[in-house]
Amino acid sequence: MQLSDFSFDLPKSLISFHPYFIRSTCRLMVMYGHTGMIFHKRFFNIIDEINSGDLIILNNTQVIPARFFGKKESGGKVEVLVEKILGINNILASIKNSKNINIGSKIFFGYKDKIKGSVVDCKNSFFEIFFHDNIDSAIDIINNIGEIPLPPYIKRFRNKLDVDLYQTVYKKKTGSIAAPTAGLHFDLPLLEALHNKGVDIDYITLHIGSGTFQPIRRVQIEEHIMHSESVEVSSSVIQKIKSCKKKGGRIIAVGTSTLRALESAYHSSEWSDSQDFISDTNIFIYPGYKHNIVDALITNFHFPESTLIMLVCSFLGYKNTMNAYNTAIVNKYSFFSYGDAMYITHNKLAPYENFII
């Protein structure tokens, strides 16, 4: 499959740079995978699409203030973006202006450069940094000196709204550098209304890394190697999924990260035994993949040629997806992290589709 097959022209005016102040008022496109029919709604109308006995699964990761600045021993400034918290005092991070930074290099952070970090390892394009602090842990230091990193295409200054609205209302476990954006549309009244309707709600954790914004650099998408991310799917969630399916209910995944977490767990030995699945995953889902768990997916409108739109194509079908995106452009839906949402049901014929135009 060619990377160019997943390209489309997107007017810059449709890229959303600001969040919806009232989360659930964003626009919602509904597409049924088996028919390709499209309906235009508001996100709070999603309650009409979900039935009593269905199970919604959300990603409860929390975005950390992963961007902060420091100084090299030479006095040169660096920008650090945390990729992963490795331990009490260690982080894995990318460093801008990393020239002359090697194992053993010292970097100073915080007020009057009082926090010292040492580069103790280099892994691909990332550096492992050890903080020399006997009081605060790495996450404490990050919380004190860092800022929430908005997606790289948003060039404006961050504001107080971003601090709140670039997190989900059900965030719990710290570790992401980007929000699970499909979940941003849920507010507490909507979650309560779903619960009152008899919809079950549970959570997985997948900490989203910087790789979510990295472009594919291969012409043939099958040659792409996905970045690795930490994932947790509890035994109780696995048991709930099996029980829901057995009773005829549907599994609704909120976000591509949730779907990837569930598929990763499904292919593990822990799934058959209903054990906790705690691991790293680099699962790459693209057309031809046969989905095993999720019946409906809530997701945003994604970048051209991204792994995210490839996942959507695998779930909804290539022709359906491209038709939905063309319809979204014509109807001026907002795209990307702060944009509008889709509710799509699984097209079981998608793996067999000859999608190349």
UniProtKB/Swiss-Prot annotation:
Pathway as given in its UniProt record: tRNA modification; tRNA-queuosine biosynthesis
EC class name: transferase
Main localization (coarse): cytoplasm
MF terms (GO), sorted A to Z: S-adenosylmethionine:tRNA ribosyltransferase-isomerase activity
Range of residues in the leader sequence: none
Keyword Metal-binding on entry: no
Subcellular location: Cytoplasm
Biological processes annotated in GO: queuosine biosynthetic process; tRNA wobble guanine modification
GO CC field: cytoplasm
EC number(s) given by UniProt: 2.4.99.17
Any Pfam family hit: Queuosine_synth
Superkingdom, taxonomy of origin: Bacteria
Reactions catalysed: 7-aminomethyl-7-carbaguanosine(34) in tRNA + S-adenosyl-L-methionine = epoxyqueuosine(34) in tRNA + adenine + L-methionine + 2 H(+)
Protein keywords: Cytoplasm, Queuosine biosynthesis, S-adenosyl-L-methionine, Transferase
This protein's record includes keyword Nucleus: no
Annotated family: Belongs to the QueA family.
PANTHER family tied to this protein: S-ADENOSYLMETHIONINE:TRNA RIBOSYLTRANSFERASE-ISOMERASE
Function: Transfers and isomerizes the ribose moiety from AdoMet to the 7-aminomethyl group of 7-deazaguanine (preQ1-tRNA) to give epoxyqueuosine (oQ-tRNA).
Database matches in HAMAP family: QueA
Protein name: S-adenosylmethionine:tRNA ribosyltransferase-isomerase
Gene that encodes it: queA
